[in-house]
Regions:
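An N-terminal RHG(E/S)-centered segment typical of histidine phosphatases
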Residues: 2-4, 12, 22-82, 90, ...
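Hydrophobic helical h-region of N-terminal Sec-dependent signal peptides
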Residues: 8-18
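Acidic, low-complexity terminal tails and accessory targeting/binding regions
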Residues: 31-36, 122-131, 209-211, 223-275
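Solvent-exposed loop/turn segments at secondary-structure junctions
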Residues: 44-47, 91-93, 117-121, 220-222, ...
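Solvent-exposed, polar/charged alpha-helical surfaces in well-ordered, non-transmembrane soluble domains
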Residues: 64-71, 75, 94-98, 188, ...
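Phosphate-coordination/substrate-recognition cap region in phosphate-metabolizing enzymes
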Residues: 74-159, 235, 239
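Short glycine/proline- and acidic residue-enriched helix-loop micro-motifs
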Residues: 141-189
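Extended, basic/helix-rich recognition subdomains
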Residues: 182-235, 240
Length: 275
């Protein structure tokens, strides 16, 4: 399946007075050392991924491969000190973070869980076969099938997919008795909570002097968030344990490097292979 905003740096003025150099430092609310770098990461492979199920807010555990890729990511991130780690409150996200921290030598780093970082909710469709739902989703927008829908919508695919679940569940197309609060989320709802939480994390870390933060979330929610905050976003599927670096500086987030890179996983796999 196919995700935009940090403080002013000290200004330094240099002048010439009476033939000599004079440097005047003007303090600001934060300096360059207060920069925050968030390693926004998708969880490792789950049983739901393998079975091609709609996961959302439902709890599917990591597979053996999912644990191994989380370990590989950890090895690939060795040398990076994480001041804090945050995850959604789903087992697949929490366990991924634990393994990444362990194998990157950050085992003592505190982990905070929050529902704001969980996957997009799909309400009555949770646990469904993705293949079985594809036709229903495509029909919402007048497409023949899921493949045509994805090709036609391009980088908007993930948001439209989320909104299709929201529309269908709002209409109770599955004929369930779910409460409104348990039904599918819209893309805007996912984007709002992701954006709010990531900004909170960045500001909190900045007040503590800046540094690196590991954040583990899920593919759809990451894609939906990134689609709102950078023109680098292309809507490509977010692979398991893929990382997107977000730098928070001068009051804004900026994507640093590629979106959804497997660089750290590949680096970790090489380290393991060379042991």
């Amino acid at each position: 399946m196919k995700i935009k905003k940090a403080t002013a740096m000290c200004a330094v003025l240099s002048g010439i007075m009476f033939g000599g150099a004079m440097t005047v430092s003007i303090p600001a609310s934060a300096s360059s050392k207060d920069q925050v770098t968030i390693y926004l990461t998708r969880h490792g492979e789950t049983t739901g991924n393998v079975m091609q199920r709609v996961q959302g807010s439902s709890d599917f555990p990591l597979t053996k491969n999912g644990i191994e890729v989380a370990n590989d990511l950890g090895y690939g991130l060795k040398g990076i000190r994480f001041k804090h780690a945050y995850t959604g409150n789903l087992t697949r996200q929490e366990v991924t973070a634990q393994h990444v921290l362990k194998y990157s030598n950050n085992k003592g780093t505190k982990v905070t869980t929050t529902p704001k970082l969980r996957e997009g909710g799909y309400g009555s469709f949770e646990g469904d076969s993705i293949a079985a739902d594809n036709q229903k989703i495509a029909n919402v927008y007048g497409y023949q099938d899921g493949k045509e829908f994805q090709q036609a919508t391009g980088k908007d695919y993930w948001n439209k997919l989320q909104d299709a679940y929201y529309k269908l569940d709002s209409e109770n197309s599955q004929n369930t008795n779910l409460a409104k609060s348990d039904r599918a989320e819209s893309a805007k709802q996912v984007q709002k909570r992701m954006s709010s939480e990531l900004l909170h994390i960045a500001k909190t870390t900045q007040k503590q002097g800046g540094g690196n933060v590991l954040v583990v979330s899920s593919g759809m929610s990451i894609n939906e968030y990134l689609s709102t905050m950078t023109n680098k976003y292309e809507g490509k599927p977010m692979q398991n344990a893929a990382v997107t670096k977000l730098v928070y500086k001068n009051g804004k987030f900026k994507v640093q490097g590629p979106i959804g890179t497997l660089h750290y996983v590949n680096k970790g796999q090489k380290i393991v292979a060379d042991k």
